Amino acid sequence: MINSIIKTIDLGDGRTITLETGKLAKQADGAIVLRMNNTMILATVCVAKDTNPCVDFLPLQVEYKEKFSAFGRFPGGFTKREGRASDYEILTCRLIDRTLRPLFPRDYHSEVFVNIILFSSDGEDIPDALAGLAASAALSVSTIPFNGPISEVRVARIDGKFKINPTFGELAKADMDIMVGATADNIMMVEGEMNEVSEEEMLEAIKAAHEAIKPQCKAQIELARIVGTTIKNTYSHEVNDEELRSDIKTKLYDKVYAVAKSGQCKNKRIEAFQTIIEEYKKQFKEKELSEEKIFLIKRYYYEIEKEVMRRCILDENIRIDGRKTTEIRPIWSEVNPITGPHGSAIFTRGETQALATVTLGTKLNEKIIDDVLINDKERFLLHYNFPPFATGEARAQRGIGRREIGHGNLAHRALKPIIPNNYPYVIRVVSDILESNGSSSMATVCAGTLSLMDAGVQIKRPVSGIAMGLIFEKEGSKYAILSDILGDEDHLGDMDFKVAGTKKGITATQMDIKIDGLSYEVLERALSQAKQGREYILDKMLETIPEPRTDLKPHTPKIEIIIIPKEFIGSVIGPGGKIIQRLQEETGTTITIEEIEKMGRIEIFGDNKKSIDAALTRIKGIVSVPEVGEIYEGKIRSIMPYGAFIEFLPGKEGLLHISEISWKHLESIEEAGLNEGDFIKIKLVDIDSKTGKFKLSHKILLPHSEKYTAIRREQHEKI
């Protein structure tokens, strides 16, 4: 017998969300079916029974999958089944993971698998925020230790008003699109893109999202109470040796403090820290250094590193590289360091370095997005690569990971608002991280801006980005906001807050908070300090190239755009694409055509102006209307016994009958001396009103003396 429990959440705008448990996937540790309108999501959570004692992190894995059948579609490809995760699915996984992960107990190390599947959709409601709610609800109805619940909502600003969880259609009209993940009390995660908005406007949006999240969290608590899972499983995943912990702190604290205050570069600091721990291990005999003991030494040593770094910042305002809290690392940049791409730039900030290149292409280079709910074409692409050598790792690079997709997406969202509207080229920016010690995604934003300017793309305004950090004293009220954080400050700190924008406002942001109880006052201060930092970085960038180049690079493909009446689109394409293919072959150009707003938009790409002009002339000929009485120079396309077919305008052919070639009577077409490919002047003498066929004449253009001679000759021959 099915004993399902349902909880309904009223969104306050006529929409409701239902959470149901006890009906589907009952063998999972927790399972929730979420429904809103025609959207149905199943979220399950399972935990491994055994735990590895030598693991000091949470092995959490979040998977989000959209079924093509959810929208009544067949998957593509030969197998006709879902394949690897799309970028959208990966980004959704990351949004959920980043909100859930900080809320598991720090000493909980069991493998946890969260699986979310979209089983039904009407194509209107956006499922990613609902997936976060479903995942949290599945954890809430399980006995897995979890300090939630959380929920996620999307907040969009449309015509000056905030809309929670807008539809795809509504989101297209928004100038602000932010995903927020939070508990009832605290913001945990923020990510979004904006059209150059102020810090105050962004904070208002976050507050609006948080208010919408609170009742969703309350509903999950009530659901857990009904199910009976408010009391979570007890666990003991860490074995501790307090005597060893005390010994390490007593002997190593001052040494670690000295290294932390020395302000060394990353590699030297790592070597110095490693030397300290290796020296400490020498006091033990080899047989005493079991795997478990080495593991504990590393863990306790890490605790000291974290405490020392935090105390240096909070007590002395000194960071591990010697900077003050608001200080930005040294910056240098260069444009056009490599000449092959259509634009390139290097941006270096401290020990983080990005090389960005720009390639300008045709409409044929558009990225086709064929996801379950999103069918679109992308004209601005940004790809982010993070090779192992960027951090000095000796390993092979095995494809693109989730992290690279996530970082690339953030940089893409930061730059997209400043790309010119209706820009004729498809743009691809590639960022290769050559060195990394904190905030390589924001270095990508800066390098990407410089490379676009070097390529001659007339961006609306240049963008810079910065990563902010936070050190918060739990026992007191002291905190420090850090500008331009290092990798260690990200790892050991309490917040990673990336902000990108122009002088006018913010274009993208991403925030992950690792602690509870962060006030809006602290967020406001962090945003204000971030603004100062990114404006400083932007000024440094503009010293290298103050504005976009006025001209494209010489080897950039040339482009010409022509708008034609809709009814001529078929004439330009021709039957089976015959006309447009011939145009491209004969002129050496690439031609694309599409219908936009009941007009035909033709883009002609070529390596030089001469080839583009040739194609343009031919197209203008195709779309021009032939007029009776006009004289044209046509090309002989084919010769028949009864005459020749002449193309007198591109795509327009007519018959030059044998009787219209010469005033002289021709017994056969061969007497005319015509050859395929020859050019001949003709006059359009008539257009058949029924068939639309063109009647051509060449003899009518011949001198009258030839006509008189031909007539006399014919009369003489009759005598």
Swiss-Prot record:
Where primarily located? Answer: cytoplasm
Q: What is catalysed by this protein? A: RNA(n+1) + phosphate = RNA(n) + a ribonucleoside 5'-diphosphate
Q: Which cofactor does it need?
A: Mg(2+)
Q: List the disulfide bonds.
A: none
Which branch of life, at top level? Answer: Bacteria
One annotated GO molecular function? polyribonucleotide nucleotidyltransferase activity
Location of the S1 motif domain: 629-699
Tell me a GO cellular component. Answer: cytosol
Instruction: Tell me where it resides.
Output: Cytoplasm
Q: Which Gene3D superfamilies match?
A: GHMP Kinase, N-terminal domain, K Homology domain, type 1, Nucleic acid-binding proteins
| Pfam families linked | KH_1 (PF00013), PNPase (PF03726), RNase_PH (PF01138), RNase_PH_C (PF03725), S1 (PF00575)
Keywords, A to Z, come to:
Cytoplasm, Magnesium, Metal-binding, Nucleotidyltransferase, RNA-binding, Transferase
Q: Which InterPro entries match?
A: ExoRNase_PH_dom1, ExoRNase_PH_dom2, ExoRNase_PH_dom2_sf, KH_dom, KH_dom_type_1, KH_dom_type_1_sf, NA-bd_OB-fold, PNPase
Which GO biological process annotations does it have?
mRNA catabolic process; RNA processing
List the EC numbers from the record: 2.7.7.8
Q: Which residues bind Mg(2+)?
A: D490, D496
Function (record text): Involved in mRNA degradation. Catalyzes the phosphorolysis of single-stranded polyribonucleotides processively in the 3'- to 5'-direction.
Give the protein family: Belongs to the polyribonucleotide nucleotidyltransferase family.
PANTHER family, alphabetized = POLYRIBONUCLEOTIDE NUCLEOTIDYLTRANSFERASE, POLYRIBONUCLEOTIDE NUCLEOTIDYLTRANSFERASE 1, MITOCHONDRIAL
**HAMAP family in alphabetical order:** PNPase
Protein name listed in UniProt: Polyribonucleotide nucleotidyltransferase
The scientific name of the source species is: Azobacteroides pseudotrichonymphae genomovar. CFP2
| Gene that encodes the chain | pnp
